[in-house]
UniProtKB/Swiss-Prot annotation:
This is Ribonuclease 3. GO terms for biological process: mRNA processing; regulation of gene expression; rRNA processing; tRNA processing. One of its GO terms (molecular function) is rRNA binding. The active site is at D45, E117. Its EC number is 3.1.26.3. GO terms for cellular component: cytoplasm. Homodimer. It comes from Buchnera aphidicola subsp. Cinara cedri (strain Cc).
């Protein structure tokens, strides 16, 4: 990759690499090379979770564990990381195989999110935990300002579970109905079975998790909880 292009990306990120190979590795999807970024992604995921958890602990001293867990989940989830990647115009720097390029992989949420995690790991390996912490907190500065500790709403699955438990009902059972599309661009249909309801509640989403959340939301509406 052109050194001028790499210099521009490093400016967006806010960090200049000593070993630029680490950054190139972080940008390489498995479709492009056997030397891909998945191991870096694994490491970066853990580093990000730790740093965000630490920041929440210090920013919100009166918040309980459940509240901090929900806020962390919001801050480290795929669409948040993809938003950060978009702010860096990261898609145009990714190294993708021809198939992924043709299918629009450079703008796919999961690929962008994974690349951000890989970049986090590459910064850590190129420097130290204190440097990568400073960089991450810089990326998240405005997001922390917008976080409302009293307004962090639980996700639909959690709300449904808590409602059913409060009524002493059995927990919902989620099962996969159908999966449409190619492996890199699938749509999931999930069925949610709740004791006392004759019909199955249906959820649809771009991942199993999202489809389950959609099914749980529909269940809450059907139960007239929301």
């Amino acid at each position: 990759m052109n050194p001028i292009v790499m210099k521009k990306l490093q400016k967006f990120i806010g960090y200049t690499f000593t070993n630029i190979t680490l950054l190139k590795h972080a940008l390489t999807h498995r479709s492009a090379s056997s030397q891909h970024n998945e191991r870096l992604e694994f490491l970066g995921d853990s580093i990000l979770s730790f740093i965000i958890a630490k920041a929440l602990y210090h920013h919100f001293p009166k918040m309980n564990e459940g509240g901090m867990s929900r806020m962390r989940a919001t801050l480290v989830r795929g669409n948040t990381l993809a938003e950060i990647a978009t702010e860096f115009s990261l898609g145009k720097y990714l190294q993708l195989g021809q198939g992924e390029k043709k299918s629009g992989g450079f703008k796919r949420e999961s690929i962008l999110a994974n690349a951000i995690e890989a970049i986090i790991a590459s910064i850590f390996l190129d420097s130290n935990i204190y440097t990568v912490e400073r960089i991450i907190l810089y990326w998240y500065k405005n997001r922390f300002k917008k976080m409302n500790p009293t307004g962090t709403k639980k996700d639909p699955k959690t709300r449904l579970q808590e409602y059913l438990q409060s009524k002493h009902f059995s927990l919902p059972i989620y099962s996969i109905g159908q999966i449409y599309g190619e492996a890199h661009n699938q749509i999931f249909t999930i069925y949610c079975k709740i004791d006392g309801l004759s019909e199955l509640l249906i959820g649809i989403g771009a991942s199993r998790r999202k489809a389950e959340q959609d099914a749980a939301q529909n269940a809450l509406i059907r139960l007239e909880v929301e």
